[in-house]
Amino acid sequence: ARTPCSLGVTAEKALIARHIPCPAFKVRPALRVTAQGELVPGQEPEKPWPGHAGRIDPEYKGYPTGVLEVHPSQEIQKLATVNAETVDTPLDSGSPVELPENTFRILDLGTNLSGFLGATITCSSPVTVYLAFDEILTRNDVHWARMGCAQFVPYYLAPGTYQVESFEPYTMRYVKVMAVGGACTIEHAYLREYVYPDAYEATFASSDPRLATLFEAGRETFVQNGTDVFMDCPSRERAGWLCDS
């Protein structure tokens, strides 16, 4: 059914000229599976991560835990990782990654990237899929709360095939895909970059390969931190804090 609503017309505005190119959105596929294992739901964590629900007040604002229909950061903490093993399975373009019920796989993007995390997810029964991520591995695992924020995206899926992509840009190299309460298949896992485009026109050559590595690292740092202004960082705080940048 259609619901009528009132619309308003926004007056035309004289916008400031951008003077810089629009970002590039190249799709970077996950390159390999680096770890796999099982999940045990319903386990209380030894050191619970409180998140920000305890800081809700008239100044901080937000939604208290009691009024939330779902509380993903509390739910994901009750998943215990067991029987984890290191693997090294290359991913060809579009090759499927099977996840039986209550299992995980860790995907490697090859380097730290900033942008929108996406994949094609297929399931034949209801399943909750968590895409948790971080820039590094901590004891061969993805520690999604390491940066003091909830670095994961949950999907509560009915049977079907879904093409999902995060609404906000994040920074990551490793992605821990978790299938809880059901099985699923992941295909075409990727990160859609959100970066400054013109830095790729620069070239560098040296007889010392270490210098070339440093140059490429500097280029990656710049394109991710300078989509339009020099930002504090491309992950937690995408803002132009001048004293930091």
Name each region found by the language model.
Residues A1-R236, G240-D244:
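Extracellular/oxidizing-compartment recognition motifs
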